[in-house]
Amino acid sequence: MIKSKLFAKHKNISHGFFNSLGGYSNGIYKSLNCGIGSKDNKININQNLKKVCQKIKCSRKNLILLNQIHSNKVFSINRTPKKKPLGDALVTSKNKLALGILTADCAPVFIIDPKKKIISAIHAGWKGAYKKIIYKTIYKLKKKGSSIKDLYAVIGPCISKKNYEVKKDFLKKFTVRNKKN
């Protein structure tokens, strides 16, 4: 588990970025596969999720996951939902709830407000980033009472610029919007 030094200062907030090592899955899924929607053996997935929960000290019932769709949909969570929300970011101020997202190439982004005790987890792929999912998550944090000056953010492991080739027309989508991109 990879931890942010920035977030480690806030003892009341547990977090971690997991890689694919040390899981129960095998074959083509040989990893710490937590993708409930994958064709991996469900027993292995549940063992992997249990392992993650033990590491971050939460019950499996309180680990909230999404059906990620590369969108800009952000959900405020106050209790464990009956089924996984369809979107790419979660926000909560409820103690004992853990927010989880799954990534490979996309960027996992955590934003916290330690003063208001509000946390968020964002699955930021290029489509979600283009559709302003991070901005929309910050907006949701502000609606819950956060101030920008109190927010801390970390980006977890994701694909590097060197390994993510794009064509000029793709790049233009982002640079037309903002020359600094």
Language model features: what each stretch is:
Residues 1-181:
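Active-site microenvironment for binding and transforming phosphate-containing groups
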